[in-house]
Each structure stands twice: as C-alpha cells, then as structure tokens.
Curated annotation (Swiss-Prot):
GO molecular function, one term: 4-(cytidine 5'-diphospho)-2-C-methyl-D-erythritol kinase activity
Protein name: 4-diphosphocytidyl-2-C-methyl-D-erythritol kinase
SUPFAM superfamilies, alphabetized: GHMP Kinase, C-terminal domain, Ribosomal protein S5 domain 2-like
Function: Catalyzes the phosphorylation of the position 2 hydroxy group of 4-diphosphocytidyl-2C-methyl-D-erythritol.
Catalytic activity: 4-CDP-2-C-methyl-D-erythritol + ATP = 4-CDP-2-C-methyl-D-erythritol 2-phosphate + ADP + H(+)
Top-level taxon of the source organism: Bacteria
Organism encoding this protein: Porphyromonas gingivalis (strain ATCC BAA-308 / W83)
EC number annotated for this UniProt entry: 2.7.1.148
Listed HAMAP family: IspE
Signal peptide range: none
Amino acid sequence: MIVFPNAKINLGLQVVAKRADGYHNIETVFYPIPLTDALEIEVREDTCDRLSVHGVPIDAATEDNLVMKAVMALRRKFDFPPLTIELIKHIPSGAGLGGGSSNASFMLKLVRDYFSLPIDDEELAAIALTIGADCPFFVGNRPVLATDLGQVFTPLPNFSLSGLHIAIVKPPIHINTAAAYKGLKHVGKRETMPDEIVYMPVEEWRGKLVNDFEESLFPEHPRLAELKEMLYRSGALYAAMSGSGSALFGLFREKPQLDKAAITDCFRWQSIIP
C-alpha cells in the first residue's frame, strides 16, 4: 500500500510572544501543496520493522526518522505485524516545507488504514502531536490558521489558491531553527493576522503578509533575499520564505520562467495548485 505525503508552505509567519518555557507562540497559515514524497508499506516475515530511504538525503538515523517514531507511537496502542517501509524523498529537509512531519502523519494514516485500526482522525492527530507540533496539520491536510506553538488549528473556510502556479527554490543553505528564533528582531503581534490577509487578493499580500524570520535571516544569508527578488522579477504575485527556511516560494498566475543562472545549485520545483 502506497501513499504520497505532501509538503506545506507557510503563508506569513508572525512570532507573537516568547513563552516562559523558552518556546515561541506563532500565527501562520499552513497551506498544503502537491510536492510529495512516496511512502509504501508491506508486512514482513521478521521480528522487527525495516525502513529504507531513497532520494533526497536526510540527516537522521533510522531510529530517529519521524516515520519510525510514528510506527512506534502506534505500536504503543495497537498490535500489528512488522513492516517493510520504503520512503522515497522528494521534499527537501531543513526547508520549512514540513516534509518530515508529513511523512510521520501519513505513516500514521497509512498503518491505520492498512490494518483497519479503530482510531479516528482526532485521536490520530493527538498521537501526531507527540511527534511534532505541525504533524497534526497533515492529518486533516487542509488550509488552517496555526497558532500557539503551531499546533492549534482554525479552519479557513472558502480559502483556496487553486489554479495558481507555484514555484519553490531552496538554496544549499542550512538554517538552524533554534538559532533562527534566537536571532529574531521582531516578537509581538502585528496589526493584522495572517488569516485576515490571505482573504485579500494575492496581489495585495506583498508588504502585508510577513514572515518575521526574513528580517533577521536575510542579512545573515543574502542569497535568500536575492532568490525572493528573483521570484518577483519572474512575475510572482507574492513571494516569501516558508517557515524558518531555507525554501522560498512564489505564487504566479501563469507558469513562470525562472532565472536558471540564479538557481543552478538550488532544489527547484513548479506545479499548479489543485
């Protein structure tokens, strides 16, 4: 049985408060996009699970892979046979696209459906939350306003980017998330929340729908700012960094012709949003 875990983008990201526990509360819109990995399972005649990962390299030992953490989380509640697991990675890691979290949540759903486990999406989302703050998003996989640590979701009725073209570029730059939070120049609520701005025409988002990480990370990594401007030069209605990076995305009316010389060393992907 095979599924295709998809990525997400952040539409705006406001860091609204630093908490007493050292973490930060955020306000952001999560939107699913059709950039996918592939995840397949079958029962194996053995005493333990086996995970094989192919495609885009990921920097994690097998036991630390979120797919395996998802399997073990379900094993604590249900009894099911050992699995052979094949994960083919297309979503780059360390990009702000939620690839690892998506893999974990899709693994939960895949095992649930494969073995007809008696657990609904709400219970599955609760398990997903123990793996990562944004993992529950991929259980429902619909546009939401994410608040608190990014795990409290408010649906966004009638909000859709369907029909727009999207381009993603990720340079070979690694962003340490903890360091990115530490370097923030703005922490606090802004006048307008992301879920209000996204209902405006996309052409009006520029300058309003802000990712707070850009202010601190762009001076440190000028290449990120250059790529964002390249997306605008290529005709983007809106362009931004996703999460704490280092992937950037642009939204377009027509299929864009990107500056190939500017992205020769980048991961790049384009599609139409369904």
